[in-house]
Amino acid sequence: MKKENNYISTDMNHKKLIFGVVIIHVCFMLIGASGILSGLKEKNIFYGVLINMIYQLTLIIMIGVAMKQYLITSFKKFKADRISVNIKRVLAGVGIAFLLSYIVRIIEMTMCSNISVSANQSNVNGYFVDYPILAVIMSVIMGPFTEEIIYRGILFRFFSKYGELCAVLSTGFLFGTMHMLFSFGNTNILLFLCQWLDYFLSGILLGFIYKKYKNIWINVSIHGTWNLIVAVIILTQI
């Protein structure tokens, strides 16, 4: 199998489709930031869930077609490692993510007088109240898969031509910024920066994990496990 910078190569016959995945993701996030989705959600939250499901399924289908061999080869490498090894990697990743999030929360409580969740997280919480099963599927399975493919499987490998550290920082910045688009203009600057820092550090962590293991399924597993923990916390508070 041909290698590119030690990463499993993607079939470049589908360059346009891969580019389309990134464009659809960016457009969806920008539309969400514009308030259109919030308006539909206020009329009926099911519209928000439906649009999110269609968006995620569209990306998954496009990714499956464009990056089939990449996903299969990566999964074979992932499965070749002992289960105990992969579990340790996932637990280590989740543990570091928890530590980073805890540090950011301390900074947030120190610097901000009014603390609230980000608009992105608020939208997710709303889905859990009315459609918990669909919310779990979107946040624990679909979201981690599509986000890791976009930010690590595609964008990280694109920026890695300028160096792996550049790839880690660039994708971390984009990951943090995209998750905060919904909050632009809706919160004070200090709170915004603290919430952005939380997502940014998560993106940096996931970037270093991909740099270390060079396997997208490890990233998906860690991202999905973290979201599962968050989902359980949300569901227990409803």
Q: What is the meaning of each model-derived region?
A:
Residues 64-74, 209-213:
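Structural signal for the C-terminal ends of transmembrane alpha-helices
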Residues 14-30, 92-97, 170-174:
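Alpha-helical transmembrane segments
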Residues 42-47, 72-143, 185:
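Juxtamembrane helix-loop-helix connectors linking adjacent transmembrane helices
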Residues 38-46, 112-116, 159-169:
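Membrane interface segments of multi-pass transport proteins and intramembrane proteases
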